[in-house]
């Protein structure tokens, strides 16, 4: 009967360094693909919301754990993504609101906004890219 014995020692520090390089590249690739998918999915009016989509920093939160993010920095990104409840719009610096309806100028002291439906372009992009990874 033949027998082989082996003794293997892992250099944890070296392993972590090599894994970090791989993880950083992998996270950067995921962030880039999610951001591109979100830009393709974003509702377009002026294009500012799509232009505000970017990738956050990559951070290592543990020995072999990496974290990254994709964000939209436009002021109105959260209400578009999450939706909004019905609410009142009142003038801040004047006595009335002024806006156009059908080419006519309208003045109002108060507007009852009906709210907006959520359009979660970032979440949907993340889920779509993640589903391709499995």
Q: Across the structure, where does each feature detected by a protein language model lie?
A:
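Short, Lys/Arg-rich flexible segments
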Residues: 1-134
